């Protein structure tokens, strides 16, 4: 969140407008809906699956488009080519959180994005033993983010940097296993009598299957699904697991599971969660190696 807040606050001022989607990570949603209005920054939520809805939301004060490559936790896949083109057409800065895809599966800068943000805590590190954020992209924009990071206190300590560098050395070895395992579990869950729906880019039944083949063809180590019986059934399911641990975070070598309604998206209003696809019984899994 330090990387996200430092980057966005370095680019936005009172009176500016940003277009994003309600499907984003709960912490980012909170930043944009709770803090940005206090700073006089307007935010419009559009449909991540419909670039034309982003274009319709643009006004004379719009400064920036913000999306996630693969959304947390519903795993909707953004058409980054279309979004980058839209931003360039309207002279806007384009920013994408690429955490769920990682640089192994998707390179948004090559698609035309100005800035790419990663949670270093997750797959880049891969060992669940640090918290970090990364932003890469245009040098002129990075300079402002670096200055904001310094002034806002989001600086990384040397030990954390060492651990992150260590983890990134094995990213390309780990990710094929993460994605293969998550694809297999998604396949087995699909059609199970206790499951309402499964979200994973590898499934032909998934709404963004075709977009995913173009944007992030290697996939992701994440998956999500809904259990019949609502949130209580989902919690019983989670607590009956013996190998997969109930815990927040994701992207480590171990497998973790949570219910977003009481973790990552607990402060997102229920109606917003439902509209985003976080229905009763919704479960998010990070599949390890």
Give names to the regions the model predicted.
Residues 1-194, 199, 210:
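Conserved PLP-enzyme active-site core in the AAT-like
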Residues 195-283, 287:
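Conserved C-terminal alpha-helix-loop-beta "cap" of PLP-dependent enzymes
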């Amino acid at each position: 969140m330090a990387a996200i807040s430092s980057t966005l606050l370095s680019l936005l001022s009172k009176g500016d407008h940003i277009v994003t989607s309600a499907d984003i990570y709960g912490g980012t949603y909170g930043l944009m809906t709770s803090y940005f209005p206090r700073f006089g920054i307007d935010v419009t939520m559009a449909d991540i699956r419909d670039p034309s809805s982003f274009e319709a939301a643009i006004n004379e004060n719009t400064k920036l488009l913000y999306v996630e490559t693969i959304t947390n936790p519903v795993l909707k896949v953004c058409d980054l080519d279309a979004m980058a083109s839209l931003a360039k057409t309207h002279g806007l800065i384009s920013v994408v959180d690429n955490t769920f895809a990682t640089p192994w599966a998707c390179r948004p800068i090559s698609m035309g994005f100005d800035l790419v943000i990663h949670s270093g805590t997750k797959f880049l590190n891969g060992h669940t033993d640090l918290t970090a954020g990364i932003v890469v992209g245009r040098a002129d924009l990075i300079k402002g983010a670096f200055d904001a990071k310094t002034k806002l206190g989001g600086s990384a300590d040397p030990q954390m940097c060492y651990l992150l560098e260590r983890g990134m050395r094995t990213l390309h070895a780990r990710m094929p296993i993460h994605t293969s395992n998550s694809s297999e579990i998604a396949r087995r869950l699909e059609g199970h009598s206790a499951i309402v729906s499964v979200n994973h880019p590898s499934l032909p039944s998934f709404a963004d299957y075709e977009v995913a083949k173009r944007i992030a063809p290697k996939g992701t180590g994440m998956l999500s699904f809904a259990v019949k019986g609502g949130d209580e059934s989902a919690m019983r399911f989670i607590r009956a697991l013996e190998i997969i641990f109930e815990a927040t975070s994701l992207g480590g070598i171990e497998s973790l599971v949570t219910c977003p309604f009481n973790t990552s998206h607990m402060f997102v209003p229920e109606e917003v969660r439902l509209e985003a696809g976080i229905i009763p019984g919704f479960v998010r899994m990070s599949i390890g190696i």
